[in-house]
C-alpha cells in the first residue's frame, strides 16, 4: 500500500460484459504505459487488489476488467457499484510494457486486459494473440481483435466447441505448434 498510495475517484461505469465479468471505469488523470496496473480498494483501510489497465493510453477513462468471485472479499462488492460511487485507486505501476516489435501475446480470461490496453494504444502491428477461455463468452473484447488480426487471433476454448475456435487448452495448442521456439517460456 505504501508503494501505491490510494486516492478516491468516482466511477463512471461498471458494466457487465459477460457472465460474472465487468469493466469498471473512471476518469483518467494520469499517464501510463500499456501493460501497467493500478491498485484498487473500496475502502482505504483494506488491502487493495492489483488490476491491469485495459483502456488505451489515449482514452479518457481508465478501464479495469474484473471477474466476480462469489465469496470473494472485493469483487462481490465491486459488482454492485454504480456510476458516482467512490473507489480508491493508485497511480500506475509495474513494468510489463507493450512493444512495437512483432510479438506473440498469450492470455486467458481477464488476463487479456494488458493486451487490450496495448491494442487500443496502437501497439497492434505484427501481433499474434492466443486467447484461452472456458466458454465461448470468455473471449472478452474479441470484436476488437477478430477482424484486424484475422488468422493471428487464436481462440482456445476448453468447454464449448465453436466455429473457428480450437477446442482444448491454450497450452495444448502451443504444444502442437512446430514453428514456435521450444526453448522459450510461454
Where are these regions (language model features)?
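Ferredoxin-reductase
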Residues: 1-83, 159
